[in-house]
């Protein structure tokens, strides 16, 4: 009901069903009828008006569901990406994909009754352990340009249904009603897909989880093998139906081959292990030949992968660069090594599953529906070292048996084969070791470092504390510039403040206020007051399609010319509003006593309860207003539907979009793209339309940006999570290392980004430019300037905390520290350095750089709290 209240519609759109367990006389237990297969069959009947199912409806009127045409099936741990459901429905509803049945109505002969999308592994799941990262494969790959080939779909126009997809309800019921006998089918997906004809749609993706440890993966594999071998009856001409009658098998030869091929794959580990042992003991020709052949079987996936990678990356091969291949080869090598170590247990596992199934099929006829969810299996298992040895003892027995056989038949080879035998004997330990949960490394900061960062954050916050006042309508002035002899003229900026502001400035100020509260610089009351006053001013400013303009006068609230809407600025402000809303929501979760203390309400006062109620209501209203402003920003205004890219901005006065685009993934506009997709303003495919050109930086890959600035790479990281093992994660590390390397090359501190530099206009204001690191940006002439921005180093705290602290200390020793944290930049460019000096200090601070610095420090000291807040928003 809460979901229906949150997403109101003309009719109920959220329903909750559960099935009552029934006593199964064959299995001798209370269970849902026919497990998942029965759940789908009964649910289909329920949608068509049946009242004799075991479903219990908890909420909702079922009459509106009787016209349901398609059902999408998901597991609990399956994620359905945005627009995937719409695309699945559109594909299955296409006239050319409509199911056509044979004369008997027992099989779909043209079109499709079910579609199976591509299933990828979630990045977070693949990073849970070394085992998962090795066997989960590549994650986070774009399904649009990388739609994979499926041999069955390519050759026979039908694929394999794996249980996560979309099916036609009427086709399902017509073909499968009464088809399968009870208490016999565990792996129903392949069988159902073979009857109603499954189509593979590999350009549509679902995201699934992967077991974190080996024992859970082994248990899942055991269950799959049992399910596959229980389909033996459907290899023959006359299987039984639900009525217990033998009927003609409608499955095609290729469908039966799919069943047989699954069974064949389960025989590979036992066959390889048997070949290894036989080759080391009794087979002619020497153990080396058979060992090499067995290893070749295990290495076949690596060989196929490498040849395919070489084919698709022939351009890189022609340049002589093979470094891009090494990470993939390393993973494939680890896969082969673990496969060798675990082959005894894998062989035992397969044989055990096969023998159990054959025994139950032919003798006991029970426990054929023995099944446990992967999540329950993971929770039940003992995953300490003792648990691994207790579970994997058959592997040790097989290893000991193989050793004994070698001693008896070929003792002279024992010395040469001992490394392999020792690996087998250590297999429980190896499985336990690679299954250890990956833990987040503690930030490499000492207590002294943390105190130094707190001090830096406090002085940086002082810029906003001093200058965001009623005189500027609680808007942050764009920058502060220290007066020098050159600026003490009548033309100097009044009070050294630039009384103008932008959406990015405002967003960074508001999140800086939240960070200041996190770090105990201000009280909760002060924070709420600041947010309320700034939001009040913002809501009174002119906007365009929900977007704030690029520049306003903070003292008069006048719109500054030229009137312009910036894509990046709108994305930054929207992202800051989302984080701010989640930060305020945290206060509503506090108990009354804690909230009263945070608000400094007098203890025991008679009206404390009323004040608390009012403050909670104030927080709720602030949250609603913030999200309303986000939803009002129409990002379609700035989007090119044909190119699927964002323009740099919109020139309001001439009603013209800029000719240039944000076409690189390594860009500060990544946050705007993410939010626009989350809002539904633009399609998901835009995310994959941005360019991902790579450059080699040392032994790592990095995405190319336009200017090679730290700002482009690391600004989105202030609120967006980083996932280990991804291309972005590798890019962050490579970029910081390259910046550090470049600093060493030119003999300067590192940290290059867009910033002010030591050149002034007629009003003696510092000029501003994007400075980058050669090798990271496409822009030419990046090596011509030598400008170091301290805020760039503070941003790098998220990637290399220890290295950033050392560089901050170096910058401070050079005079970069001031009352508002650190100066804007140090300019080492020779033609801009005063005579007799080694560098010029750009004696200014900029509001958005101040905000980025505070957020970066807050994240490093508060365990990425801003990122967690941003990703907590359901939208």
Residue spans for each PLM region:
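Carboxylate/His-rich catalytic cores and anion/metal-binding grooves
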Residues: 1, 123-124, 205-227, 231, ...
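Membrane-embedded multi-pass helical conduit in multi-pass membrane proteins
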Residues: 264-365, 393-441
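Internal catalytic domains of large membrane-associated glycosyltransferases
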Residues: 1-244
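Long hydrophobic segments that form regular secondary structure
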Residues: 166-169, 187-197, 211, 247-248, ...
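Flexible, glycine/threonine-enriched loop-and-boundary segments that flank and lead into catalytic domains
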Residues: 2, 25-28, 46-72, 100-101, ...
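Membrane-proximal soluble regions of multi-pass membrane proteins
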Residues: 22, 143-151, 181, 205, ...
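Loop-to-transmembrane boundary segments
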Residues: 35, 243-271, 326-346, 361, ...
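Ser/Thr/Asn(+Pro)-rich, low-complexity disordered segments
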Residues: 385-393, 411, 415-419, 423, ...
